[in-house]
Amino acid sequence: CVDNARRYTRERDAALALQRNLLPHRLPEQDAVEAAACYRPADELTGLGGDWYDVIPLSGARAALVVGEVPGHGIEAAAQMGRLRTAVRTLAALGLPPDEVLAHLDDLVARGAQDQDGAGDGADGEGAEHADASQAVGAGCLYVVYDPVDGRCAMAAAGHPAPAVARPDGTVEFVDLPQGPPLGAGGPPFESAELVLPEGSVLALHTDGLLTQGDRWTLADGRERLMRALERRGTTLEPSCRGVIDALVPDRPHDDAALLMARTLRLPAGRVAEWELPVDPAAVAEARKAASRRLGAWGLEELSFTTELVVSELVTNAIRYAGGPIRLRLIRERALLVCEVHDAGATTPHLRHPRTTDEGGRGLLLVSQVTRRWGTRFVPDGKIIWAEQSLTGPET
């Protein structure tokens, strides 16, 4: 009847609007990878499913590559997918390693399911508000971090297939990645794997739907088909991504299928400068001079004043509160100048707003005012405090 048709139209319009807001309209430009993605949903009614992909720029010119899937299809699966995608982006901004990102995401899913169980016995309607939270239990996620400075690639998986890697020499293989439990299911801690990728390698992150479509073929057959498709890929990433999807996934798939392909890039050595600094207050002046000379070589003299201020404050903090060894690094990205100070400390610095009578405590406040953004990330031998400035000078 007319009412049913109108209701169908409203639901479909709402679903399509949700889809447009959940998946990235376009993948962000950054210096770590060249990326392309394709998605083919199983739900014919709405074109929606629980699979997602993402590319997230990180500090230090790095990028996070993400593919995940929520059980089920349709608008409810898509809503839970959007919740997890937002959570992953929030955790990525903290600079956490892949295994810790998945550990926090696992806790989020488990607590959401517990909240639903607790609300189910409450007043009428209260349980319905949380009813969809349990749908995220059993979700899978693959989280990869790639560093274009040294080619290191770290990754961890929660109930999700390992990515394939197509190397520049033509070989294709699947990464030997420990498989953690699905999100919210409980189990042993997540483990990370790390490898070094040559420039021009292609990572193929995918969901289960790319490898298996009902009883059409086995998982082993699907892996073999993907390897052959990657061997036949072209040089241009976007049509290659579409070609792989078309070769492996039917027009009406049994399961949602998502594919994210990323070709690794390397920053030229001339766009990275690094200095070892002694734990000596006199090193601050030398660090400022070295940074200023490097900016001159890069044609970025207009950033010398703010960069010297950032270097002075971050190096001084490292000497005063953390100790050595201390390293200063400048990275020139296409659109950003990154200043990093590495020290052996294990505590996160906090931005404070000093009173007018205070004689100190303004360092990080100044850094936050003169830079685009700043933050801290922990590494095995200490921490890195970083700050970014937007580039205005000509590219060299």
Briefly describe each language-model feature range:
Residues C1-V2, Y8-R12, L16:
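Amphipathic, heptad-repeat alpha-helical coiled-coil "signal-transmission/dimerization" linkers
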Residues R7-R12, P24-P28, E44-P71, I75-E76, ...:
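Conserved subregion of the PPM/PP2C metallophosphatase catalytic domain
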Residues D31-Y39:
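Long, charged, glycine-rich C-terminal linkers/tails
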Residues A37, A157, D343:
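Flexible glycine-/small-residue-rich
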Residues T307-V315:
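Hydrophobic alpha-helix within the catalytic ATPase
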Residues A318-I319:
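Short helix-loop "hinge" at the ATP-lid/N-box region of the Bergerat-fold HATPase_c
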Residues V338-G361:
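Glycine-rich/acidic phosphate-handling loop/turn and adjacent ATP-lid/helix
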